[in-house]
Amino acid sequence: MQTTDGYDYFAFISYNSKDEAAAKRLHRTLERWKLPASLVKEKGLKPRPMQKLFFAPSDIVPKELEEVLKENLRASEHLIVVCSPTSAKSAWVGFEIDYFCSLGRKENVHLIIVDGEPKSQNPDTECFHPNLKKHFNDLLSANIHERHFKLPYLNRQRAYVQLIAAMLDVKFDAIWRRHRRRMIEK
């Protein structure tokens, strides 16, 4: 089943195995995300546009790993890079970034920081992979640790909404106000 613009997957989630818990949480959140009806109608989007995401290891079929990754990167409209000090050192994350950018879809690369600091110049805390810096002059990202609220859960939710708004090319407030209201109602 194809999703948007002829792609099999809305997005490919690139992460290091040490960040699997954060990547799984992101994967679950995005696949279950439902857009406000007003936004669906106004922008002509699907109510659940991110239902189909490529997430390894659950979506990997036994073959040669590099070929499987290339095939699924080609089949994905977006690349989400889960950024952390461990992913910044990962050869596979670097490969996925390089290959996706070689497809001519650099504008569809999105970053979410789950650990570490951007542009820290310290390899123990740097969260951006060197290949990101090679392809992009300015790196914009959602950061689950950015403190807007006292509760870490709300900061994480805000970062997810930032990521979703960027991928769908909609205004952050168009999604955030509605999502925040739903969280308060619960």
What residues fall within each predicted segment?
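C-terminal interaction surface of TIR/SEFIR-family domains
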Residues: M1-E31, K52, S58-S76, P85-G94, ...
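Short mixed-charge
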Residues: R32-F54
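Inter-motif core of Ras-like GTPase G domains
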Residues: L79-V81
